[in-house]
């Protein structure tokens, strides 16, 4: 679990996301509280429940991006799900408990990689010995350098080890037994009907038959990596991995539920949306704290942090059932983005859009340079299009940039090794249709 301070978390988010200070502070405090809870005495730790967050704001203002960056910072099991993918129990679709199972699957991969790193040195030593066993038979007859004064097997093995460590044998080929690619099993049973029982039929039937292997001639450099992986797999205790993964999910897991407004009912509407409230009622016990059965054992959700987000264009947060509203005590409103924010988005972040397009064109030998006036004009046109049509926030910049560089991107391979300056006149010329046309529907994503 990360021990970044709230200020450090906000500072890290600032490198990628412009504005939305309130939302950044809320998730930073929530993440820090996860670490604080781990430092509390055992008898009180179980009593401290996470304060779930709901982020409210129009599309394209940074809700999902905050979640993505939070996942990388958290160093904890983190999964993003869309509420609209789930259906009430009894309907066709995924049941809500699958989000916890998916989180556990992710945690197992995370812990397994951590444990594999711990045994990497031992795995490398064992892999080296196996590689020497593969190289040694007939080595003297094939390589005159290995004969002579060190004709004994021990001497040959040591000499071979030195050559192997130097990389002198990397291009030599050895015969190695590797797992053969198998045809995927046909799904007779859909996972939706069986996952709540913790049964994976594909895995169950797959384990009934031995895995097929085949012998392949591969380079020593490639064989070394395969053998290290095989040895690490043998050294890692999967029982321990499963136990640690369950514990980490229970104590520091984070679930980000996007599009939560899509399951909000509107004044008791009936018809095709009748199952929306059912999905909310199914999500409720998981957010409140319950035990979910998985194939690795039961997982308690009492201390999993839930972060929900929605645009709430049509529905309102108050349209969610009261019990679910009460489980998200921290509400954060994200503000719409204007011209100044668009200018900053284009220039300030580490992965700024302008830098991305410059890097793409650089691969064709074309060096792009945007003047400040040109970037401000792009921001102004994006704001204008958003105000006259659907406001899709920062995503509008992708549309504008693609239109702006469409001609240049098409002709780039024929005009290598050039420097191109994008000035305000070029922007106005390329985007004149958008700036002039009142009916902008053909430019809407």
Curated annotation (Swiss-Prot):
Example of a GO MF term: ATP binding
Subcellular location: Cytoplasm
Extent of the signal sequence: none
CDD domains, A to Z: RecA-like_HslU (cd19498)
Predominant subcellular localization, coarse grouping: cytoplasm
Keyword match ATP-binding: yes
GO annotation (BP), single: protein unfolding
Subunit structure: A double ring-shaped homohexamer of HslV is capped on each side by a ring-shaped HslU homohexamer. The assembly of the HslU/HslV complex is dependent on binding of ATP.
UniProt similarity note: Belongs to the ClpX chaperone family. HslU subfamily.
Purpose of the protein: ATPase subunit of a proteasome-like degradation complex; this subunit has chaperone activity. The binding of ATP and its subsequent hydrolysis by HslU are essential for unfolding of protein substrates subsequently hydrolyzed by HslV. HslU recognizes the N-terminal part of its protein substrates and unfolds these before they are guided to HslV for hydrolysis.
Protein name per the record: ATP-dependent protease ATPase subunit HslU
Organism of derivation: Syntrophotalea carbinolica (strain DSM 2380 / NBRC 103641 / GraBd1) (Pelobacter carbinolicus)
